[in-house]
Amino acid sequence: MAERLTTEARKQALGGIPDWTEVSGRDAIGKTFVFKDFNEAFGFMTRAALVAEKMDHHPEWRNVYKTVEVVLSTHDAGGVTALDIELARAMNAIAKLTPG
């Protein structure tokens, strides 16, 4: 099982992942992605889902039209772990490759 990051380690990791922030009231990180339209948003989710499945680490997320809200936390560890940081970085990379 992945180990929960300390507060300091989480803050340091977040410093290297643009636009990800701590989720208020939870030991979790989150980001809202905004795309050109629904097709791009859903395409992002599809590509991110493939990565998440390979990692066996799945996000909490919500899609409304061109917006995708993501929350990451490792439930087994009770908070943010290196897996969440890795998936956040991957999602940022996928978003950069998404046209628009």
Curated annotation (Swiss-Prot):
The keyword Lyase applies. It catalyses: (4aS,6R)-4a-hydroxy-L-erythro-5,6,7,8-tetrahydrobiopterin = (6R)-L-erythro-6,7-dihydrobiopterin + H2O. InterPro entries: PCD_sf, Pterin_deHydtase. One of its GO terms (molecular function) is 4-alpha-hydroxytetrahydrobiopterin dehydratase activity. Gene3D superfamilies: Transcriptional coactivator/pterin dehydratase. The keyword Lyase applies. One of its GO terms (biological process) is tetrahydrobiopterin biosynthetic process. Coiled coil: none annotated. Its EC number is 4.2.1.96. Keywords: Lyase. This is Putative pterin-4-alpha-carbinolamine dehydratase. It comes from Bradyrhizobium diazoefficiens (strain JCM 10833 / BCRC 13528 / IAM 13628 / NBRC 14792 / USDA 110).
